[in-house]
Amino acid sequence: MKTWKSAIKASLIGLLGLVSINSMAQTNWPTAPVTIITPWAVGGLADQINRAMSEYGKEQYGQPLLADNILGSGGAVALTEYTKEKPNTHKLILGGEGSFAIAPLTMKVAYKFEDFVPVINIYSSTFVLVTNPRTKVDSIPSLKEYIAKGKKIKIATNGTNSSEALQSAALFNEMGAKYQIIPYDGANEALTAVISGEVDFATTHASLAKEFVKAGNAKAVVAFDEKKLVDDVYNLDSVVDHGYDTWMINTCAVFIRAGTDQAIIDKNYQSLKNILENPKLQQTAKNIGIRLDIKDGAAVKAYIDSTMDKAAKYSKLVK
């Protein structure tokens, strides 16, 4: 009897010890530098804001916050590599609707949305269609005239498994155009391609194209949004203004490995939220041209879930 009771007592003590250790690990996390991986090109909006955020990591985490880049296949390489991480990892990764709603439909990927937990949204961005001034296209009506010439149109986008690629293909398909999506390893490269005349059009972030449009190096055609884009540079109709439901707002959010303890997810959320609310960081974001849009993980998941149907409808058009 004593042996039986002793065994139970030992088991309970061991179990309580494991709970205590696990609880302590959650409380002490992070115990090493925290890294946020950007799965897209160096110099792009996501990379710039990630590097800016890293400057304020130490005061929030008590550990250095590092910015890293892993490139390839529009983000799929980094996201696939990230699935090797264990729950409670010190590495996080950026992603968005392109990573999870579009990529699995346009290419074979070795990861699932369920492999990740959204932590916090960093920014949201409207895409615009821009062109080289030589095309003389500056609106949907003039784009229709250009398409009517029957020429095969080349459109630069950040990869093929991206919101840019999907929206471009959807719009040009619905307009009856002959088109080809030309993928690049980043939004900057896609924009450079249209400015140089390597391609006819590019779909990119409105904020990224703004200075080039202002300088006359590129012409803005239409905003991929449900409302007009009007500011000190743009005065653009939306695709919805012309009857096309071919739009998605780009999101850039931070994710961590599924199975991570909620306490660690919460710690990341609060630390990153504090960084994003720092006035110095907000000024940097403004200088970059980023519209910070802080949302919790539940809101990020809800948005990505909502894009699944639209992505499924248009994904086969990316060619």
Residue spans for each PLM region:
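Mature extracytoplasmic/periplasmic domains
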Residues: 273, 277, 282-303
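N-terminal (or domain-start) structured segment
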Residues: 26-115, 151, 160, 164, ...
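Extracellular/periplasmic bilobal clamshell ligand-binding domains
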Residues: 296-319
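Glycine-rich beta-alpha junction loops
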Residues: 98, 159, 205-208, 224-228, ...
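Bacterial N-terminal signal peptides that target proteins for export
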Residues: 1-12
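Hinge/capping helix and adjacent helix->loop/strand transition within the periplasmic-binding protein
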Residues: 32, 81-90, 97, 104-189, ...
